[in-house]
From Swiss-Prot:
<comment type="similarity">
    <text>Belongs to the radical SAM superfamily. MoaA family.</text>
</comment>
<dbReference type="GO" id="GO:0051539">
    <property type="term" value="F:4 iron, 4 sulfur cluster binding"/>
</dbReference>
<dbReference type="GO" id="GO:0061798">
    <property type="term" value="F:GTP 3',8'-cyclase activity"/>
</dbReference>
<feature type="binding site">
    <location>
        <position position="282"/>
    </location>
    <ligand>
        <name>[4Fe-4S] cluster 2</name>
    </ligand>
</feature>
<comment type="pathway">
    <text>Cofactor biosynthesis; molybdopterin biosynthesis.</text>
</comment>
<feature type="binding site">
    <location>
        <position position="107"/>
    </location>
    <ligand>
        <name>GTP</name>
    </ligand>
</feature>
<keyword id="KW-0411">Iron-sulfur</keyword>
<dbReference type="InterPro" id="IPR010505">
    <property type="entry name" value="MoaA_twitch"/>
</dbReference>
<feature type="binding site">
    <location>
        <position position="265"/>
    </location>
    <ligand>
        <name>[4Fe-4S] cluster 2</name>
    </ligand>
</feature>
<feature type="binding site">
    <location>
        <begin position="270"/>
        <end position="272"/>
    </location>
    <ligand>
        <name>GTP</name>
    </ligand>
</feature>
<feature type="binding site">
    <location>
        <position position="33"/>
    </location>
    <ligand>
        <name>[4Fe-4S] cluster 1</name>
    </ligand>
</feature>
<feature type="domain" description="Radical SAM core">
    <location>
        <begin position="17"/>
        <end position="243"/>
    </location>
</feature>
<keyword id="KW-0456">Lyase</keyword>
<dbReference type="Pfam" id="PF06463">
    <property type="entry name" value="Mob_synth_C"/>
</dbReference>
<keyword id="KW-0408">Iron</keyword>
<comment type="function">
    <text>Catalyzes the cyclization of GTP to (8S)-3',8-cyclo-7,8-dihydroguanosine 5'-triphosphate.</text>
</comment>
<feature type="binding site">
    <location>
        <position position="39"/>
    </location>
    <ligand>
        <name>S-adenosyl-L-methionine</name>
    </ligand>
</feature>
Length: 337
C-alpha cells in the first residue's frame, strides 16, 4: 500500500500539479456483475476469498461528503453492476442529500432497469448510462453472455416513461463484432433522445490477445461523422471524456471515447474510488491509495481530505497506453471502468 503524508489542506480544491480541476468522482460500490462481457469479465464474476467486503453505506456517505467539500459536483455509481447491491437506493438517497452534489449518475447493464428505474429516479439519480454493445439480440448475447437484450431495451423505454429526458448508451467498439452496426445505431437514435457513445476497446493485463484481435480506433467513426455533417460540441466542466457530435437531422447524439488519442488526458476531471475504498488517480495507473481507514467517523474527515489532496499531487500528466503500459489492472471491473 502506498503511504501518503498528512497535512491540513483547509479549503483546498482538488487541483493537480498540471492545474487540472477534479469535479467528478467515479465511485464503484461493488465488483460483482451478473453479465459475462467478453471484453471485461468473460469468465463471469469471481469473488476473491478472504478479501475485504465492499464499502458500507456509512463509509460511502463519509467519502462522498469529503469529496463534496473539496469541490466534487458529480458522482457516478459504478461497479461491477451497482444495482445488484440491496442498499443501492439507500446509497443514492444518501448521496443526493449531500450539499454540493449536483449530479448523481449510474452506469448499469440495464438488467433491472425496466423494473426499478422509477425508484432510481425517486432516489435522486439524475442520469443513466446503459451498456448496449449490439442492437442484434444474437450478437448482444454473444458479447455479454446473457440473453437479456429485450429486457434492456424495455428498460431504456421505461426510463423515458418515468421522466428521464436523455439516456446515454455505451457500446464498446470491437472490430468484426459490432463495428458493422454503426449505421444501425445511427438510425436508432434518429428520433430518440439517446447519446450513443462508442468506447474504444482498452488494453488490460488479462486481455492482450483480445485487444490485438478486436481493437478499432474511434477515429474511423469520427471521420465518418464529420464527413456526413455532424458537429463536435463543447464540453462542460463536469462532462466525461466523450467527444460529443450532434446533427440537425437527429434527435440523438453520438459520443466517442478514444483513450489512445493524443491529449486525451489533458481535460481529465475525474477520480476513482474502488468498491473496497482505494483511491485511483487513473484508470491505467497505480495500485491505489487506501482511504477506508479514514471512513469510519466524521471526525476523520479533515485527515481524509488531506490524504486525497496529497495523493492528487502525484497524478501523472497522462497515461502510457501508447507504449503498452496498461498499469496494474487485470480487468476494469475492479474500479468501475
Amino acid at each position: 500500500m502506498q503511504s501518503i503524508p498528512i497535512k491540513n489542506v483547509g479549503e483546498s480544491r482538488l487541483v493537480d500539479p498540471f492545474q487540472r480541476q477534479y469535479y467528478y468522482l467515479r465511485l464503484s460500490i461493488t465488483d460483482q456483475c451478473n453479465f459475462r462481457c467478453t471484453y471485461c469479465l468473460p469468465d463471469g464474476y469471481q469473488p476473491e476469498a478472504n478479501k475485504p467486503s465492499f464499502l458500507t453505506l456509512k463509509e460511502i456517505t463519509h467519502l462522498a461528503q469529503a469529496f463534496a467539500e473539496m469541490g466534487t459536483e458529480k458522482i457516478r455509481l459504478t461497479g461491477g453492476e451497482p444495482t445488484l447491491r440491496k442498499d443501492f437506493i439507500s446509497i443514492a438517497e444518501s448521496i443526493t442529500n449531500i450539499d454540493g452534489i449536483r449530479q448523481l449518475a449510474v452506469t448499469t447493464n440495464g438488467y433491472r432497469m425496466a423494473k426499478d428505474v422509477a425508484d432510481w429516479k425517486q432516489a435522486g439519480i439524475t442520469s443513466i448510462n446503459v451498456s448496449v454493445d449490439s442492437l442484434d439480440p444474437k450478437m448482444f448475447h454473444q458479447i455479454t453472455g446473457i440473453n437479456k437484450f429485450d429486457d434492456v431495451m424495455r428498460g431504456i423505454d421505461r426510463a423515458f416513461e418515468v421522466g428521464y429526458n436523455k439516456v446515454k448508451v455505451n457500446s464498446v467498439l470491437m472490430k468484426n463484432l459490432n463495428d458493422k452496426e454503426f449505421e444501425q445505431f445511427l438510425a436508432w437514435v434518429k428520433d430518440r433522445p439517446i447519446q450513443m457513445r462508442f468506447i474504444e476497446l482498452m488494453q488490460t493485463g488479462e486481455m492482450d490477445s483480445f485487444f490485438d484481435k478486436f481493437h478499432l480506433s474511434g477515429q474511423v467513426l469520427a471521420d465518418k461523422l464529420l464527413k456526413n455533417g455532424w458537429t463536435l460540441q463543447h464540453k462542460s466542466h463536469t462532462d466525461g471524456p466523450a467527444k460529443v457530435f450532434t446533427h440537425s437531422d437527429y434527435t440523438g447524439e453520438i459520443g466517442l471515447i478514444m483513450p489512445y488519442e493524443k491529449n486525451f488526458c489533458a481535460s481529465c476531471n475525474r477520480l476513482r474510488v474502488s468498491a473496497k475504498g482505494k483511491l485511483h488517480l487513473c484508470l491505467f495507473g497505480e495500485e491505489g491509495i487506501e482511504l477506508r481507514d479514514l471512513l469510519q467517523s466524521h471526525e476523520q474527515q479533515g485527515i481524509l481530505q488531506a490524504r486525497i489532496f496529497a495523493a492528487l499531487q502525484g497524478k501523472r500528466e497522462h497515461h502510457y497506453l501508447h507504449i503498452g503500459d496498461t498499469g496494474v489492472r487485470n480487468h476494469l471491473a475492479s474500479i468501475g471502468g
